[in-house]
Amino acid sequence: MDIKKLESYAELIVRVGANIQKGQDVVISAELDQPEFVEMLVEQCYLAGAAEVRVEWTHQPLRLKHVKYQTVERLGEIKDWEKQKLLHRAETLPAMIYIESADPSGLDGLDQEKWGKSVQMRWKVIKPIRDSMENKYQWVIAAAPGKAWAKKVFPELGEAEAVEKLWEAILYTSRAEGDGVKAWQEHNADLKSRCEYLNSLGLRKLHYKSANGTDFTVGLIPQAQFLAGAEDTLGTNVRFNPNIPSEEVFTSPMKGQAEGIVYSTRPLSYRGTMIENFSIRFENGKVTEVKAQKGEDALKTLVNMDEGSKMLGECALVPFDSPIRNSGIMFYNTLFDENAACHLALGDGFANCIKDFENYTLEQCREMGINSSMIHEDFMIGSEDLNITGETESGERVQIFKNGNWAF
């Protein structure tokens, strides 16, 4: 891949994604297989004015070893130095850059029950610290092709060719070719106009129906709003784009208001385990049944992480006619696949989906209906025949999606 293109992509992530501010600290999280691209990111952060850039490396084989050999008690323990690091992060609010490149199946064989219990134990310490940081700092998730990931996406190609092909797909779908800054400005303007229309309707419910069996209704929070694209930090008003790429218009639904069944239309890679061809049934707002042809144990672990993991935290609208879907590529990565189809998310909701959320505490946003959970996992339900009908407070029905695409 042309070095200049990768440098431009790194600059896009830093300046349009995280929007690093002069004098701000930055933390980059990446897999061990990305030293060259991370080096580019570090340089771009400093060129943007960062005071210090730290890199935290991850490696799937090590996680497999840790979970296999450590006790659940040791896995779930947060040492004092770890807690102090988290508290320091909450105080200094560094910008966070996450680079995804891991093998979608790289954690197959992981003891899901053991890992899930350890995460639940750690969450008791992490949650109050994370809550104190809510909406106060910039973050962005972007991607770079790992070798195993590239071979998963393009199994018919050799390793080097697969990596090159995946780089091309990432740059195209991320609007990183040519003038990326201008492309994102235009894209955000389009997303904003759709949010404004949806917010003007006063929707209280969304009903989803498609030929694969999806027949599902979700309630919306009266004080909530649809958001998309760029966000602003609380207090400092720094604009950033948390997902590169992003095609979604989303909101957080009313906790505990969901009825019916939804069928997945794309695989889900959950913590390195593939979950495929699955369905989720909701009654009285909570998951009551899950089925999957592959990865059902992982799916059951997901929905039983805590009370909030059985409920929804997000409803996202993505047209079937989108750049990622039109690429014809199955990425086996939620960052991309969620932007190829309408999706829902189990778990934590977004406080900034409440109108004027800056005037409320996080707890007040929860009381209005924003779900709380240690997880937030997107799964795709969009199809070319998906119809979504909105219902307003007065009972008026409005067509939102028709045959997989915007109806307006």
State where each predicted segment sits.
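Active-site bordering "gate/hinge" segments
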Residues: 1-259, 390, 396, 406-408
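Short solvent-exposed loop/turn micro-motifs enriched in small/polar/acidic residues
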Residues: 11, 199-201, 271-273, 308, ...
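Short conserved micro-motifs at the rims of enzyme active sites and ligand-binding pockets
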Residues: 109, 152-154, 274, 302, ...
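Short linear motifs in exposed loops
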Residues: 219, 290-291, 401
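Long, well-ordered mid-to-C-terminal structural blocks that present hydrophobic/aromatic surfaces
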Residues: 251-307
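Active-site lining segments that contact anionic ligands and/or coordinate catalytic metals
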Residues: 257-259, 275-277, 284-287, 310-314, ...
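Dual-mode signal for accessory low-complexity, basic/Gly-rich regions
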Residues: 289-358
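Extended hydrophobic packing segments that form well-structured cores
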Residues: 363-408
